[in-house]
Amino acid sequence: VHWTAEEKALINAYWGKVDVGSVGGETLANLLVVYPWTQRFFEDFGNLSTPSAILNNPKXXXXXXXVITSFGDALKNLDNVXXXXXKLSEYHCNKLHVDPVNFRLLGDVLITLSAANFGKXXXXXXXXXXXXLVGVVAHALARRYH
């Protein structure tokens, strides 16, 4: 993807509004609740039997912070997201064996929660650029699967 200067500015402004500490845990928790089959990748996290258990699970919160931080790291290298996510792609493909469609699902949950948290301050142009970014990051993470 070739990002325009305007898209880069929109993405960085959008991400600057994201409360990583809050949205990170919520994003993974919502993914695990709404798409329960994704829980199989987190069996070593312990109790994921209810939404409350997932939200209060310290391992889920730590993994979510790492995931959201990695997403933020991709923003620092928008012109080469595939290279920035190469190690994560290899790890998810070769060690975790995560179904790559889950990367897109996680990104969609992140966009939904962010928009809900932004309220009226969420602009359609920024949400469209963030949705394109989620697709680029999901593709970069799934790259080692091909």
From Swiss-Prot:
Entry comment describing in which tissues the protein is expressed: Red blood cells.
Binding residues annotated for heme b, in chain numbering: H92
One Pfam family here: Globin
GO biological process: hydrogen peroxide catabolic process
GO cellular component, one term: blood microparticle
Keyword vocabulary terms for this entry: Heme, Iron, Metal-binding, Oxygen transport, Transport
Record's keyword annotation contains Coiled coil: no
Domain Globin span(s) in chain numbering: 2-146
InterPro entries: Globin, Globin-like_sf, Globin/Proto, Hemoglobin_b, Hemoglobin_oxygen_transport
Coiled-coil regions listed in the entry: none
GO MF entry, a single one: heme binding
Job description of the protein: Involved in oxygen transport from the lung to the various peripheral tissues.
PANTHER family given in the database record: HEMOGLOBIN FAMILY MEMBER (PTHR11442), HEMOGLOBIN SUBUNIT EPSILON (PTHR11442:SF7)
Subunit structure: Heterotetramer of two alpha chains and two beta chains.
Family of this protein: Belongs to the globin family.
Protein's recorded name: Hemoglobin subunit beta-1
Biological source species: Saara hardwickii (Indian spiny-tailed lizard)
